[in-house]
Amino acid sequence: MSTIIKHKQFNNFKSWTMDLCGRPLTIEVGKVAELASASAMVKYGDTTVMVAVTVSPRPRDGIDFFPLSVEFEEKLYAVGRIPGSFMRREGRPSLPAVLASRLIDRPMRPLFPYDFRNDVCIQCTVMSVDYDCSPEVAAMIGASACVSYSEIPFAGPIGCLEVGYCDGEIVLNPNQEQRKTSRMDVTVAATAEKVVMIEAGADEIPDEIMYAGIVKAHEEIKKQVAFINQIVAEIGKPKMEYDHAQFNQELFDKIVADFMDEAKAAMDTDDKNVRETRWNAMIDHWHEKYLEEYPDMDQYLEECTYKFQKKIVKAWLLEGHRVDGRAKNEIRPLAAEVGVLPRVHGSGLFTRGQTQVLSVCTLNTLAACQKLDTIWEEEEKRYMHHYNFPPYSVGEARAPRSTNRREYGHGALAERALVPVLPSVDEFPYAIRVVSEVLSSNGSTSQGSICGSTLALMDAGVPIKAPVAGISCGLIQDDDGSFQTFIDIQGVEDFHGEMDFKVAGTKAGITAIQMDLKNDGLTHEIIKEALEITKDARYAILDEVMLPCISAPRTEVSKYAPKMLTMKIDPDKIREVIGKGGSVIQKITAESGATVDIEDDGTIHIASPNAEACDAAKKMIDTIVFVPQVGELYYGKVVRILQFGAFVELAPGKDGMVHISKLADHRVEKVEDVVNIGDMIWVKVTEIDDKGRVNLSYKDAVKEIKAKKAAGESVK
């Protein structure tokens, strides 16, 4: 019996294309991942990202949050590479992949219904990379399109663009060459009406340019939103009905009516612990009063607490009143200290209200640079910033867990804020690691880590170009569109507010921005105001607290830090310094006690716990690569005598010959009449022949030395 074969027909296949900043963006639907709730193959230039979205049929029980999972998955075959791991396959997500996942999650999460409890998974798999076309942009557009046309309720779509600044011009979706020279790297996500996400790193960019870039990106994003709406109009599915999270409105109304005065008194304090103690006591009163009437009230208490606190905080903030009594533009009490830990290379303790961060700086040789196995053409990572948020910082009684995405994200934000002010490798040939330990958290720990890390870097003697300060801006909006911004948000304002707009920078300009929202987006007016008030706050923090603590980087690194010395040799001499099988460089390391790292361009970095070892290693390398120069004087040792002349050692292993005719102005019958083995004499290089043989003159050297002495010049 013959085999029956039927050819698969993709009858539902559809494709849409638009121009995105001069390059084609294509979204294909109906050909891949057919069993997912929604899927698409997104092609931007030659960058290809497969996006699949799935939703569970039923809500997850026992949770009070929306269970959204976003995964940005890098495949190294996308750039024609085999993973460097032992198993030669992709393992846990790289840091850039984790940050890309957060980048997609943050603008989309607020646009899902607040009480939606069905699991939603968005998986973006990078399958091909064109470095001129960002995979993150393609992934976010694809995720937005898939969720929008799926049955999942979503208040989108959103679009996404990257913004650069090259040669004084704002550039949208810069290509690879433009990114290398761009002074800012900004990712903007937005709906047709409002901006929903900003993530930025910049080289001290003025606020006005940053704002102009965001506005320009939003105008272009509106075209993407219209493009996705066209797709939804053609293939969009009916939105699913879902079980709304249960809430007892009747119980809540009674609590508000009976306990408003007590609740306001509980909230009105700058001490987080006092507030929580008061609130817990009030919840006990709720039990006493309502448990008999509402025996199932425990399941609603958390939501009642959230709504009640938000009601009070929102009303107060709209009136210009804050829970701790501050004005809208008032920063909590600050303290800064350096040199906190005695034997580390640098440390800084920064305290803002009940938020406290200890940052510690460690210096090492460039061999300690981090190597990343990612889809990006990134060189070794010289500066590493790690952020730790232990449970005790918020008073939780549990064991610490492994690093989570939030910690990765906050560390990356601080890193992005500080990289623009770091010295070049030539100026400061060290690998630098800063660890920010959150000791106490009541809001804005990421910005505290930026301030504390600036202090630690300066304490460590890192010659940063300018100190960096970070501050956050909050937002509350009324139903009529009126709004109130406020500076330096604390925990309760972050929890119940609608925005956490983090800005870091120097007095010259912005170095980093991260904007997180809990609403449907920001108008341009709000963004402009947030940039203005955070600028004033940065200046105040620098002038009044950080610079009085330490006005400039220390002139020397810590005595406990490795000493570094950099030198440059002819690249052709590298093999001589390394030696066969590394024998020469191993000998240098063993005899000097210093470590030696050699780059392909001939740059050599020497490191040791003490300067003497560095100098010894440098002297040995200088000897190995020594090349005599014609016309120069050298002081050497006579090591061999032949009938026709004497051989003089200019450096270990480097000899030259003084012909008998070059020993004196008169005729010399015997070499030993002028010099003997072991004599230290001055010689002048007269010639280096095509075979590399060095010819010397003793008599010319004597004449030149006499002339210099007569002229009062020293001979070295």
Would you name each region that the model predicts?
Residues 151-267, 457-555:
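Mobile "lid/hinge" segments at catalytic clefts and subdomain interfaces of large enzymes
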Residues 2-243:
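Long, basic N-terminal domains or extensions that often function
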Residues 560-562, 566, 571-716:
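Single-stranded RNA-binding regions, centering on S1/OB-family and related RNA-binding modules
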Residues 124, 196-201, 242-246, 257-266, ...:
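Short, hydrophobic beta-strand segments
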Residues 2-56, 241-377, 562-576, 584, ...:
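Extended amphipathic alpha-helical scaffolds
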Residues 24, 36-121, 126-128, 133, ...:
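Glycine-rich, flexible beta-strand/loop modules in the N-terminal catalytic cores of phosphate-handling
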Residues 44, 53-55, 72-74, 124-128, ...:
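Flexible glycine-/small-residue-rich
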Residues 114-120, 155-157, 224-242, 273-274, ...:
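Flexible, glycine/charged-enriched surface loops at secondary-structure junctions
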